[in-house]
Amino acid sequence: MVQTRSFTGVLLVVALTLAVPRLAEAGPPLICHPFDPGSQAVLPWGSGPAWNNPDNRYDVQQLTSDTLRLLTREAPVLARMENLRRATIYAAQDPRVANELLSAVLARALSSVSAGAPDAQALFNAGYLIESYKQAAHMHRYSMLAPPTAARWTLRSEPGGNGYSLVIRAMSLAGGSADMEFAASLMSEGTASANHRRRAAAAAAQGSLLARNLQNASRY
């Protein structure tokens, strides 16, 4: 019961994080570094390698339902990372959609916690989206967007909550996950980030999807 109350508090906290973010030259990694999802289903996207290349034909009003449909318990972590990256960029176009998506993803996690059976995948999704929204807000705050994009970018304030702690808890519930270690490395700094990346690399089989994503990330 204590554990359930603790997680409920984490998910509902509204205090803003005041720490200065890591501002890598290539931009915040959860937003600016596309992930290779392999053959898994992902949200529609434009062609080309650019990080900010949404499909102009996509109906953003469908974002919450489409994203929840893709965030199944069976979906691999790397596919969820790319879907949540794309979802964050789409959500930046419409503040109502952004709030709706975050609320829906948090509700899934909170529901599992309230039921006394915290779901690792739901907690990961919630933590990852919180940190993605934070990094998206950092991009606007620190003038990292081209003027036309900045004018349309509505994710300007950080959401409350500590998404990183939810990802760490998700890893514990999952019994360890190299893919989640990789994700955690992209939302932490210094020694913590390096340790997450080291553990992910140690567990990544040669030629695996994780190995490819680690190699891609090393270029930034």
Would you name each region that the model predicts?
Residues M1-L11:
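Bacterial N-terminal signal peptides that target proteins for export
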Residues G9-A19:
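Bacterial N-terminal signal peptides
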Residues L18, F35-D36, A136:
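N-terminal low-complexity, intrinsically disordered patches enriched in charged
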Residues V20-R22, A26, A91:
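N-terminal export/targeting leaders of redox proteins
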Residues A24-R85:
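N-terminal leader/linker segments that initiate helical-solenoid repeat arrays
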Residues W45-G46, T72-A92, A115-A150, G176-G190, ...:
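Amphipathic alpha-helical repeat scaffolds of TPR domains
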Residues D55, D59-T67, A79-N83, V97-V105, ...:
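Structural recognition of alpha-solenoid helical scaffolds
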Residues V97-V113, H140-L173, S193-G207:
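Alpha-helical repeat scaffolds
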